[in-house]
Amino acid sequence: MSSLSVFHVSSPDTPNKVLTHLEDIASTLGEHGVAFDRWEAAAPITPGASQEEVISAYRTQIDKLMTEHGYVTVDVISLNSDHPQKAELRAKFLEEHRHGEDEVRFFVAGRGLFTLHIDDYVYAVMCEKNDLISVPAGTRHWFDMGENPHFVAIRLFNNPEGWVANFTGEDIAGRFPRLED
């Protein structure tokens, strides 16, 4: 189940609130310019599927997002527990960073913990199949796929180069809950 846990930066062990209803999650994130919605991920995709398979299966949804929001680049991150670089990728994504452009993720299989650091609060969003999250440019965040990843996410960007992270050098991500496998 998708959820949102909101923490004050001074209390990483205890969330101020935990939300599980789509409307509550979307409203809370929307106050900070973050869009959260549910789309139907109808095509059967399994973690480990190739980028070409995923893009082909979801071409209609991808084209709609690219047209409506001006995204110019699409890629797919598709990982399962057998991926040879899972530890390196997890470590990279767990470092707090930001992008110079919006980042959109549409989860078409599995789950991941997308965590946002906004002012004095941390918003941990458990994203699952059918979840669409759009994070505005400049928002500090990190992503945890767990020790044994099992997810497929379509990522869209305004930048033709795709995923370009500007790491903050902060160690805040290590103080907050991780995705439990």
Swiss-Prot record:
It comes from the Bacteria. It catalyses: 1,2-dihydroxy-5-(methylsulfanyl)pent-1-en-3-one + O2 = 3-(methylsulfanyl)propanoate + CO + formate + 2 H(+); 1,2-dihydroxy-5-(methylsulfanyl)pent-1-en-3-one + O2 = 4-methylsulfanyl-2-oxobutanoate + formate + 2 H(+). One of its GO terms (molecular function) is acireductone dioxygenase [iron(II)-requiring] activity. Keywords: Amino-acid biosynthesis, Dioxygenase, Iron, Metal-binding, Methionine biosynthesis, Nickel, Oxidoreductase. Its cofactor is Fe(2+); Ni(2+). It is an enzyme of class 1 (oxidoreductase). The record marks 102 as: May play a role in transmitting local conformational changes. The keyword Oxidoreductase applies. Pathway: Amino-acid biosynthesis; L-methionine biosynthesis via salvage pathway; L-methionine from S-methyl-5-thio-alpha-D-ribose 1-phosphate: step 5/6. Its EC number is 1.13.11.54, 1.13.11.53. Gene3D superfamilies: Jelly Rolls (2.60.120.10). GO terms for biological process: L-methionine salvage from methylthioadenosine; L-methionine salvage from S-adenosylmethionine. The record marks 96 as: May play a role in metal incorporation in vivo. InterPro entries: ARD, ARD_bac, RmlC-like_jellyroll, RmlC_Cupin_sf. Pfam families: ARD. Fe(2+) binds at residues 97, 99, 103, 141. The record marks 105 as: Important to generate the dianion. Binds 1 Fe(2+) cation per monomer. Ni(2+) binds at residues 97, 99, 103, 141. Belongs to the acireductone dioxygenase (ARD) family. Monomer. Catalyzes 2 different reactions between oxygen and the acireductone 1,2-dihydroxy-3-keto-5-methylthiopentene (DHK-MTPene) depending upon the metal bound in the active site. Fe-containing acireductone dioxygenase (Fe-ARD) produces formate and 2-keto-4-methylthiobutyrate (KMTB), the alpha-ketoacid precursor of methionine in the methionine recycle pathway. Ni-containing acireductone dioxygenase (Ni-ARD) produces methylthiopropionate, carbon monoxide and formate, and does not lie on the methionine recycle pathway. This is Acireductone dioxygenase. It comes from Pseudomonas savastanoi pv. phaseolicola (strain 1448A / Race 6). The lineage of its organism: Bacteria, Pseudomonadati, Pseudomonadota, Gammaproteobacteria, Pseudomonadales.
